[in-house]
């Protein structure tokens, strides 16, 4: 899956953000 962890998301709820 083309998904990466954004610093902002990992800092808030540790969720994967969709790769733009």
From Swiss-Prot:
One of its GO terms (molecular function) is insulin-like growth factor binding. It comes from the Eukaryota. Its main location: secreted. Keywords: Glycoprotein, Growth factor binding, Growth regulation, Secreted. Residues 2-20 form the IGFBP N-terminal domain. Induction: Up-regulated by growth hormone treatment and down-regulated by fasting. It is found in: Secreted. GO terms for cellular component: extracellular region. N-glycosylated. Signal peptide: none annotated. The keyword Glycoprotein applies. The C-terminus is required for IGF-binding and growth inhibition. Binds IGF2 more than IGF1. Inhibits IGF-mediated growth and developmental rates. IGF-binding proteins prolong the half-life of the IGFs and have been shown to either inhibit or stimulate the growth promoting effects of the IGFs on cell culture. They alter the interaction of IGFs with their cell surface receptors. This is Insulin-like growth factor-binding protein 2. It comes from Oncorhynchus tshawytscha (Chinook salmon).
């Amino acid at each position: 899956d083309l998904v990466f962890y954004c610093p902002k998301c990992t800092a808030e709820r540790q969720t994967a953000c969709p790769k733009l």
